[in-house]
Structure formats: C-alpha cells, structure tokens
Amino acid sequence: MHSNSSSGSRLCLNSLFSSLPLKALALSTMLFPFHSINAGKTLQYNTVVNTNTLTVVAVESPTTVFKEDQFLHGFGYDLARNYAQSLNVKLDFKIVADNATALRWVQQGKANFAMTTAGLSTIENKGLMSFSASCGDTVDLQKNGLNPELSWVFKQADDPLTQTASGFVCQSKQNGVTQQLASFYNRNVVKPEAWSTIQRDLTTRLPIYKASFKQSAAKYDLDWHLLAAIGYQESYLKPESVSPTGVRGLMMLTNSTARAMGVSNRSDPAQSIQGGAKYYDQMLSEYDDIPFPDRNWYALVAYNMGPGAVNQIQKRLQAQGKDPNQWVNLYNYLQSNKTRNGRYKQAVQYVTRIRAYLEHIKTAQTRINI
C-alpha cells in the first residue's frame, strides 16, 4: 500500500541510504557527492515526496518497455517500478517518441528522470547528468540481447533523488535483481533463426483459430493475443498434438483439467481454447493480490506447473525472508534450482517464450495478416 503522507515517503527515501550496502552507497556518493542543498532549487526529491508519485519518461524499446494494449512490462520498466516500490510511492510511467523529448521533459521538470540510450555528450550538452541503469553491469545486458547503454538521466547531481537512485541501481546489481530481470527479458530466448518458422506458422495457422481465441478471451476478459501465445507454446497451434504424458489438443490439456473445464473433446480446437482460457483465468484468480504484469507471469507458471507447485515455492521464499509475491524472487528461485528440477527449467522456458511470442504477435499483426 502506498503512503499518502509526505512524511511516510520522506522516511522511505531517507532510510534507503541507511539500508544500502556500503559498496553501493560508497559508489553513489563517489559519483554524486552530497552538497548542501540550495533552498532556491526545485528538487525532484521534493516533487516525489509532495505528490507521492515518481514520474519516469522513456522511449519504447526492447530494453526499456513494451507497451501494447494493457501490457506494460520490460527490463527498464520493472527496474523503475522496483525503485518506486522501494520509495513507497506510485509510479507514473510515460512513453514518448524519442530521446530528445525524454531529455526535454527532465529539463522542464515534467519527469523526475528519464530512461534513455542517448549518448553521454548529448546528455551533458543539455546540462543533465546520468548513470548506468545497470550500475555498469553491461555483460548481463549484452548477453541477454539488451542495450547496455541504458541510462537514468536526472536534472541535478546533488538532488537526493538522484543519489538514492544511483544507490538503488547498484544495490540491484549487487543483490542479483539486475541479472534476473535481464535474464527474464532476454531478447535471445527464441533463437533468431527460429523466427522465420514462427512467422510462417502464425501466418498459416493463427487466422484459422483467431475467432475462437477472441471469443474465449472476451468471455473471461483476457487478451486473445496472450491466449494465442500460450497455444503456440503448447502445440504450435496444432489441434491434433499429443504428448507422451497424455496431454492433448491445441492448448494441451490433461484429462482431469479438461473435465474440470467442461471440455468433452480435447482435440476440438474451439473446446480446447475455451478450456485453456477458463483454466488460465482460474490461475489469474489464484494471484489476485499480485499486481500486473507480475500476475500474468505467476499465472503462466501455474498453468504450466500447477498452482500447488507455485504455492510451495512461495512458502519457501517466505521462509527465506523474501517477498513471495515479487516476480523477480519467484523467477530467481526457478532459475537457481532448474538444474536439479526439470520442471523448474521447463517453467522458465515456458513463461519467457510466451512473453516473446506475445510481443511478436502484438507487434507483427499487420505483417502476419491476422
């Protein structure tokens, strides 16, 4: 829950410094030595405190944010969202057409900071300052196909907001959050050479089942593109698919799940899609207390592994003193234990590929004629 008082927000901002690891805090203060605050300056820190809102501006890109319909996610977005949560304030995330506009918003005070890939000279020429959004962790960004030049850009170096943000991104690097977010938003999760086959499959098969996807999505207030992405991951949109374990149909339902969802013929595409939509809706309901976009990722893992398996992991996370409702914690657990548990490895592949397929379907609709 967000604090509605300035004092509550101010406490979170101030206490962040005291909770930072010494190394991260030292780096923050080394980069931005704390000067005595000029009372005449308009500090972004004060704006955030007074409005209880952190306003961030960015240009849509594979590294910063994906925004289509109700979907809003991405490496940069999630990092900014985590920062806002650490300050106990709301995040107001704005998307503009280009880096020049994003930098201008910071200059004009329309945004507290910008996430941008603008060059350092461009930023400095506008009288702004910046630091690496990954605290210099360019290796993890590069190996996951993300732009290592992503920066957070602020109006003033001696603003407390700038200094807490610098400490936060270095703390995120130190505790592994940066690495896990980069891994989840890996642009290479689907091999580049595979996209031509995927494009051909979607062009050929998706139009056949589009009406069923849309009808079932409307019934359960879901996004039909997401259902289609699940279907492609499950069966490549082949209704006759069957696995060695007995799951069958376009949405690859087990016998017990099919019966529970009212599906009498798993090989019937319309029935399978309806059953898959109903089951996914039930998985979303399991995690009503988790905000989007994280709720989608939890529901997808539960669709793949079963909600009982997810709930067991949540209990283990809680026992470790970690927030069980933070996607980065669940994802890290799956990643860290996938070598000893094949189901965890499968779940990681499942959710990351569906995310990639979803983004592709939404941004390639005109090219694949759906």
Describe each region flagged by the PLM.
Residues 20, 186-236, 270, 287:
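Export/targeting segments at the very N-terminus of extracytoplasmic proteins
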Residues 240-264, 271-282, 325-331:
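Substrate-binding/active-site groove segments that recognize
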Residues 222-238, 273-277, 299-304, 354:
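Short, functionally critical alpha-helical segments immediately adjacent to catalytic or ligand/cofactor-binding
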Residues 166-204, 317-319, 367-369:
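Ligand-binding clefts/hinges and TM-proximal coupling segments of bilobed small-molecule sensing domains
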Residues 58-62, 127-163, 333-336:
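Periplasmic-binding protein-like
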Residues 74-86, 146-185, 207, 357-364:
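Extended ligand-binding regions for polar small-molecule ligands
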Residues 154, 299-364:
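Catalytic and substrate-binding regions of cell-wall glycan-acting enzymes that process beta-1,4-linked
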Residues 37-118:
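Extracytoplasmic small-molecule ligand-binding "clamshell" domains
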